[in-house]
């Protein structure tokens, strides 16, 4: 199979908010073009991980090549790139979009434009995409196609008069989508005589083939047996096989400009292939790499520890396996006095953290405790150096630190008007600064700058409960700003508990500390001596609760007689308790940790 004429190729992606039906539309397109037989079809063909199907989200970018004979009688090759829709994976989305020339914008005709639709559409517009609006779910009784068309024009500012009305579930009007792709989206540009230049869109690990790399050829031709160079990672490989996905893998002789396919080159680790890198031929390299490549930086960190210390080796093996498939996930070993051996892991965001944790528990059936998530702080030291702080327990002496900077995000929230007050109050409470507020039809669009530290805990859940689930939320990291942050330690019986220390804003320290102490007071079982539970900033105690001692009734065997006899026994007991408090160790049960850490999240 040789390279196709470039004017018959269409590369497109589907942009939509979670649950607006983009994976179902992809299924229908695959079915209609006959890429899979009816027997092989499953729901959400392109969401290959169970967790993707269950949560109804797409995590890894996938691709499929469809052959379509259009009404003008020509054979077209359509390459569909299925992109992740969630905020945490925006970089993967931007790379997938860079590999296409156009997008289908899928909007639920009953719900209208949501925050993530906006974020992804703006990315598509930045990538100079031609955009074809598609109204999905028009078979629902609640569908209001005309109102949604107006909304698309008003909010996004693209012409929606020719939006294609479809129902992906019933398969209504799907042919019109294919015709619109062929007619409205531009063919790719590229020169097949030029040196090879290809964009690395995504990669994953296959047990038999090693790393499979998804590529979009920009110039030149990729053939089997070529020696290729990854420009960002500066590594050289020999190509073993070249092919395309029709969702099943199919080998081809070569891939020409504008085509999307895969290559395998006995690469051992996904970490060697960085999303967004440029692939070129080693013998005849291209002059400049493709723009927009940046190494992935983890944003949220948290400690993962096995509940049973004997499981540590299994956890290490499981992490290694996940890392093979997900290069944006990083980890290193750490030990904690309270929780034993575990790992400090870096993630792209909260959803990513949840997914990794769930995959560890489900695919490798491990029981895990996760410590409170924290973000990466920058410490400007007094001697003029800068350090990054991933774990609050590693905070150096306060006297050596000049200033602390924390990451801020720019958040866009779309909410029905009725809940606007609650949403604004939530953002205000989280130290947010309002940037913009305007109305889109009956919904308010609020733009806020917020510290990421305040968002990692329970911001998303709170937002959903305030707005009864109607608000949608999208963010990107904007910059680092100086903040008045302090390290709060929790002391139990005057001993600091490392797993519970955290960095908080000075204004929030007291309330957070008090809540934590009250929680621990209920969770730690009573001992034979009194236990103080304290929250401290440096040497200053800001909150305290006391766990009462269990006391034995030592005067029970005295009846009548002199008071001094009872006194003596009580004093003797008091002496013993005092000594006990000095040498006694407080056992904090595992459940107490899990519950205390849950309070924060």
Swiss-Prot record:
Cite the SUPFAM superfamilies for this sequence: EF-G C-terminal domain-like (SSF54980), P-loop containing nucleoside triphosphate hydrolases (SSF52540)
Q: Which domain of life is it from?
A: Bacteria
Known catalytic reactions: GTP + H2O = GDP + phosphate + H(+)
Q: Where in the cell is it found?
A: Cell inner membrane
Q: What class of enzyme is it?
A: hydrolase
Q: Which UniProt keywords apply?
A: Cell inner membrane, Cell membrane, GTP-binding, Hydrolase, Membrane, Nucleotide-binding, Protein biosynthesis
**Membrane topology summary:** Peripheral membrane protein
Q: Extract one GO cellular component term from the record.
A: plasma membrane
Looking up InterPro entries in the UniProt record yields: EF-4, EFG_III/V, EFG_V-like, EFTu-like_2, G_TR_CS, LepA_C_sf, LepA_CTD, LepA_IV
> Which CDD domains does the protein's record reference?
EF4_II, EF4_III, LepA, lepA_C
| GO biological process per UniProt | positive regulation of translation
**Would the keyword Transport turn up in this protein's UniProt record?**
no
Note the Pfam families from the entry.
EFG_C, GTP_EFTU, GTP_EFTU_D2, LepA_C
First-listed, main subcellular location of the protein, grouped into a coarse class: membrane
- A GO molecular-function annotation: translation elongation factor activity
The residues that hold GTP are 19-24, 136-139
Which family is this protein grouped under?
Belongs to the TRAFAC class translation factor GTPase superfamily. Classic translation factor GTPase family. LepA subfamily.
Functional summary from the UniProt entry:
Required for accurate and efficient protein synthesis under certain stress conditions. May act as a fidelity factor of the translation reaction, by catalyzing a one-codon backward translocation of tRNAs on improperly translocated ribosomes. Back-translocation proceeds from a post-translocation (POST) complex to a pre-translocation (PRE) complex, thus giving elongation factor G a second chance to translocate the tRNAs correctly. Binds to ribosomes in a GTP-dependent manner.
HAMAP family of this UniProt entry?
LepA (MF_00071)
Q: What is this protein called?
A: Elongation factor 4
Protein species of origin? Methylobacterium sp. (strain 4-46)
């Amino acid at each position: 199979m040789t390279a196709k004429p470039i004017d018959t190729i269409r590369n497109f992606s589907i942009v939509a908010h979670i649950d607006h039906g983009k994976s179902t539309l992809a299924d229908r397109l695959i079915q209609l073009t006959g890429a899979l037989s009816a027997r092989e079809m499953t729901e959400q063909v392109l969401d290959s991980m169970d967790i993707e199907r269950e949560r109804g989200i797409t995590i890894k970018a996938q691709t499929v090549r469809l052959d379509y004979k259009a009404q003008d009688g020509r054979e077209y090759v359509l390459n569909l790139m299925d992109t992740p829709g969630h905020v945490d994976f925006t970089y993967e989305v931007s790379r997938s979009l860079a590999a296409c020339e156009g997008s289908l914008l899928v909007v639920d005709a009953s719900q209208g434009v949501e925050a993530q639709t906006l974020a992804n559409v703006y990315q598509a517009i930045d990538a100079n995409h031609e955009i074809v609006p598609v109204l999905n779910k028009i078979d629902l009784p609640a569908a209001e196609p005309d109102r949604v068309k107006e909304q698309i024009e008003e909010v996004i500012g693209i012409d929606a008069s020719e939006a294609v009305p479809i129902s992906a579930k019933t398969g209504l009007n799907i042919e019109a989508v294919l015709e619109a792709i062929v007619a409205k989206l531009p063919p790719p540009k590229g020169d097949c005589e030029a040196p090879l230049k290809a964009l690395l869109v995504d990669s994953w690990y296959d047990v038999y083939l090693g790393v499979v790399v998804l590529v979009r050829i920009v110039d030149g031709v990729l053939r089997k047996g070529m020696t290729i160079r990854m420009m960002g990672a500066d590594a050289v490989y020999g190509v073993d096989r070249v092919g395309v996905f029709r969702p099943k893998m199919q080998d081809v002789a070569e891939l020409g400009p504008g085509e999307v396919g895969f290559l395998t080159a006995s690469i051992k680790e996904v970490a060697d292939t960085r999303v967004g890198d440029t692939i070129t031929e080693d013998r005849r390299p291209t002059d400049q790499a493709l723009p927009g490549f940046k190494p992935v930086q983890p944003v949220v960190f948290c400690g993962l520890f096995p509940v049973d210390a004997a499981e540590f080796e299994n956890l290490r093996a499981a992490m290694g396996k996940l890392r093979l498939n997900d290069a944006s996930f990083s980890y290193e070993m750490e030990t904690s006095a309270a929780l034993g051996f575990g790992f400090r892991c870096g993630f792209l965001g909260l959803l990513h953290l949840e997914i990794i944790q769930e995959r560890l528990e489900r695919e490798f059936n491990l029981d895990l405790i996760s410590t409170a998530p924290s973000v990466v702080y920058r410490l400007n030291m007094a001697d003029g150096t800068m350090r990054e702080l991933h774990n609050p327990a590693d905070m150096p002496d306060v006297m050596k630190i000049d200033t602390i900077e924390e990451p801020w995000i720019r958040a866009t929230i779309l909410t029905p008007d009725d809940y606007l007050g609650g949403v604004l109050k939530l953002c205000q409470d989280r130290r947010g600064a309002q940037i913009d507020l305007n109305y889109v039809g009956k919904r308010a669009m609020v733009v806020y700058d917020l510290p990421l530290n305040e968002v990692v805990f329970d911001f998303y859940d709170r937002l959903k409960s305030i707005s009864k689930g109607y608000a949608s939320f999208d963010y990107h990291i904007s910059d680092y700003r100086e903040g008045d942050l302090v390290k709060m330690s929790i002391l139990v019986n005057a001993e600091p508990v490392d797993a519970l220390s955290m960095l908080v804003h000075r204004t929030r320290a007291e309330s957070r500390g008090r809540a934590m102490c009250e929680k621990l007071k209920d969770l730690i079982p009573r001992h034979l001596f009194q236990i103080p539970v304290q929250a401290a900033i440096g040497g200053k105690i800001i909150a305290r609760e006391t766990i009462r001692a269990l006391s034995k009734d030592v005067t029970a065997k005295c009846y009548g007689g002199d008071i001094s006899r009872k006194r003596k026994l009580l004093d003797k007991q008091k002496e013993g308790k005092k000594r006990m408090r000095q040498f006694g160790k407080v056992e904090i049960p595992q459940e107490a940790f899990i519950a205390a850490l849950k309070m924060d999240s």
